[in-house]
Amino acid sequence: MRCPILLADMNSFYASVHQAMEPRLKGKPVIVGGDPARRHGIVLAASVEAKACGVKTGMTVREAAALCPQGIFLKPRHSHYINFSARIIRIMKDFSPLVEPFSIDEAFMDVSGCGLLFGSSLEIAVKLKARIKNEVGVLCSVGVGPNKLLAKMAAGMQKPDGLTLLDFPDVPVKIWPLPVRELFGVGSRLEKRLRDLNIHTIGDLARYPLQVLKQKFGLVGHILHLSASGIDYSPVDPCSLERVRSIGHQITLPRDYWGYNEIKVVILELCEIVCRRVRLGGYAGRTVSLTLKDTDFLWLSRARTMNYPTASADEVYRVAVQLLHQHWPPWKPVRMVGVSLAGLVKNRAEQLDLFGEAERARRLHAACDRIKDRFGEHSILRAVSLTPAGVLRERGGEAKHG
């Protein structure tokens, strides 16, 4: 089979889940995100009908309401999205055991060797789309290619409900004319650096001297050069999510946050969430990362490694605040905050504690975890969550997992 890799990308996934769950929403402009009553926050997803009005993911709810006054605004419900995603993965595994979830609404599948059972890769894609539509109730675009890179790019070429095949001979014709930002893995900062080298299209990147790219970007330059030619050697890995490298959480704020005091409230809330998930997995971690984005969504990410692994929110918070003070000026507004803990190990041993503080903290965490297990994640919160800067109580904890 020449092009055995498929990428299934659910269209307007969050909004589509709500439409699938509530038939009255079908055909209506559904907008998910923020606080519908107060008209603040950002759009996480928009249905096809809302997108037709100009609504885009990432814009403010207020902007979306102006573009689509008839829009139906809904709060996100991540538990439902996770459930739907799991159902879709189960359908994909009916065709092949080689399924790799890429995000909550995307997954790769390698159908090598499945031809005798299900037909060609295109025939499998048609059957997959039909089953997801009929059994789950959402539409998806499927990209088909010889590798994950081309399958991923193919999936984005025809939305919604598309089916596109990209093979190596298609790269010069269909891929090279595209802006370099369209190449998978190229973000805004990397795009700017490439433009400084007069690289504006993917074709420009493919034709650029490899040695210069390696001098400018190191190993990343080599990978970029390969990607621009449609080359990707990474396999579909069904076990990718089982090897937990880090656990993180991030929140897009409902407004600009100014000054350290406001930002530190959100950082503490995130540390609580992250460390709760770390403990649930039986882990402890050493490397704390803090990610911040400003109002233009230009981002900064910094990390620091501690001397010992921990699952304590207070210890992670202390390091995250140090990173904040060292790398983010107090006058600069913040619109998104993320915290993650990496360098994870199974939490079998505790650091030697001469004064019993670690043991007291461990018992406190265990007690809080038991309360949350029984009564829900937000049955007990830090007092700072009740201040104007707190976001978890109002949002019910709906934020993006890392």
From Swiss-Prot:
Residues annotated as binding Mg(2+): 9, 105
InterPro entries: DNA/RNA_pol_sf, DNA_pol_Y-fam_lit_finger_sf, DNA_pol_Y-fam_little_finger, DNA_polymerase-Y, DNApol_IV, IMS_HHH_1, Rev_trsase/Diguanyl_cyclase, UmuC
Gene3D superfamilies: 3.30.70.270, 3.40.1170.60, 5' to 3' exonuclease, C-terminal subdomain, DNA polymerase, Y-family, little finger domain
Annotated keywords: Cytoplasm, DNA damage, DNA repair, DNA replication, DNA-binding, DNA-directed DNA polymerase, Magnesium, Metal-binding, Mutator protein, Nucleotidyltransferase, Transferase
Primary location class: cytoplasm
Domain (UmuC): residue spans on this chain: 5-187
One Pfam short name: IMS_C
Active site location: 106
MF-aspect GO terms: damaged DNA binding; DNA-directed DNA polymerase activity; magnesium ion binding
EC assignment: 2.7.7.7
UniProt xrefs under SUPFAM superfamilies: DNA/RNA polymerases, Lesion bypass DNA polymerase (Y-family), little finger domain
Cofactor note: Binds 2 magnesium ions per subunit.
PROSITE patterns to which the protein is assigned, alphabetical: UMUC (PS50173)
Reaction catalysed by this enzyme: DNA(n) + a 2'-deoxyribonucleoside 5'-triphosphate = DNA(n+1) + diphosphate
Site (Substrate discrimination): residue numbering on this chain: 14
GO BP annotation list: DNA-templated DNA replication; error-prone translesion synthesis; SOS response
A Gene Ontology cellular-component term: cytosol
Enzyme class, spelled out: transferase
Essential cofactor(s): Mg(2+)
Family, per entry: Belongs to the DNA polymerase type-Y family.
Record-linked PANTHER family: DNA REPAIR POLYMERASE UMUC / TRANSFERASE FAMILY MEMBER, DNA REPAIR PROTEIN HOMOLOG YOBH
Record text on subunit structure and interactions: Monomer.
NCBIfam families: PRK02406.1, PRK03103.1
Record protein name field: DNA polymerase IV
